[in-house]
Amino acid sequence: MSEIREARLQKANSLVSKGFASYAESFSVSHTTKFLIQKFDYLENGQEEDFSVSLAGRVMAKRVMGKIAFFTISDQEGQIQLYLDKRMINCNLENQKLLSFEDIKEIVDIGDWIGVYGTIKKTNKGELSIKVEKWEMLSKSLQPLPDKWHGLTDIEKRYRQRYLDLIVNPHSKNVFKTRAKCISFIRQWLDNRNFLEIETPILQSEAGGAEARPFITHHNTLDIPLYLRIATELHLKRMVVGGFEKVYELGRIFRNEGISTKHNPEFTSVEIYQAFSNYVDMMNLTEELIKDIVFNVCGSLVINYQNKEIDFSKPWSRISMKDIVKKYTGIDFDSFSGDFQSAKQAVKSINVEFSNKVNSMGRLLNEVFEQKVESELIEPTFVIDYPVEISPLARPHLDNKEMVQRFELFIVGRELANAFSELIDPVDQRERMQLQQSLRDEGDHEAHCIDEDFLNALEIGMPPTGGLGIGIDRLIMLITNSPSIRDVIPFPLLKPEITSNKNEKLPLNEVK
């Protein structure tokens, strides 16, 4: 590696010695590869078009055959071939200060960024090309690309050095284009329905809105602990109290929890709140939004995910947690009539393991669902009516205070959305937060804190409201057929690589 780097560095220096920059300040690009390929697709083999272009890109392939050379360069939109003829490039050297054909042959390596000026032609073999008249070095690459056309096969290195992954794996680049398109579409969809995007604090004095362990930092001037937000819920609800009836925020959430193919400590979600609505309204909104996203991005409501066909056009199932647990396990929680010991024995008989934290019928029901049912829900399924113990911010059912008006959406065995009719009764909310605080005081780091300002806001008065949260990363996984959340986050959190000396980090390019 050091020999290759040294040779390339010498080439960069030779450019400077000739009076040219090896790292340009700018370059005027007239068109993209995508535009040129679409516009001139009609050309016949061997036909030329006197259409002037200037194009910049990274060199991905290089073939020199005497006085002719063929390069392939890549820009954000795709790839195109360069046709370089020694006579054409060298004909103006006496009148202008230009780089020669010999220069491009000797100095340019795969991985370099170059800019070219020329016209359009289609080769005799049918390859649309730019017939280069002159060229410039834009940025000299000092390190070679991995495996050229074969891609970056080391999965962990793909995540650590995403820039290399994007260069050599076209699929990865398409994933992040799709991600950007989805996020843009969601914002447009909500804006068109008169939702207002709100920016809530990332640094908060209280971490609330979800059962999750927060990241803690410290503000030096104020000398107080602060928390990275674990949800945007409580601040968005404050906006509803203030009179904004339809609000949302699409942004980053931080939870100090485990890492898996489904979890990253830093992730993206959209939370949506709509006054005068309940969880049924939010179910309808969720189904409409996700169907529109899938169709807009994929062009169809039927997609394939990891060899499973998902049909979004069919009516989405809506079933209570109790009923779906009974369906998949045979256990009817209503039959226990509150007898927790009998329920535990029945649950143990189907090999469900649980900790002492599972100390109520509702938590036990949820444990059975997560271990025995969740992974079976392949087609879009709304699981509704959750236990109150695990839903401290949701409105209870009038006819059954032990259950709340909440749903979660599951697709391919993963939770994709979570929503409920919001709890707007300040007295009930205080009682639930006090219970959560007592659990926290006993060592449950994921339990909610009491947020006095939020409770005060509820006492001012909050209208009936439906709230919804959608995990953007999991949605992108589904749409792009990606098996891991790390595939759809540009820079996922990874444990730093270190040498045997734990205090000495290796440069990434020298990590074996």
Swiss-Prot record:
Residues that hold Mg(2+) 2 according to the record: 415
Catalytic activity: tRNA(Lys) + L-lysine + ATP = L-lysyl-tRNA(Lys) + AMP + diphosphate
Cofactor binding mode and count: Binds 3 Mg(2+) ions per subunit.
Entry keyword set: Aminoacyl-tRNA synthetase, ATP-binding, Cytoplasm, Ligase, Magnesium, Metal-binding, Nucleotide-binding, Protein biosynthesis
Residues engaged in binding Mg(2+) 1: 408, 415
GO biological process: lysyl-tRNA aminoacylation
Subcellular location: Cytoplasm
Gene Ontology MF: a single term: ATP binding
Oligomer status and interactors: Homodimer.
Entry protein name: Lysine--tRNA ligase
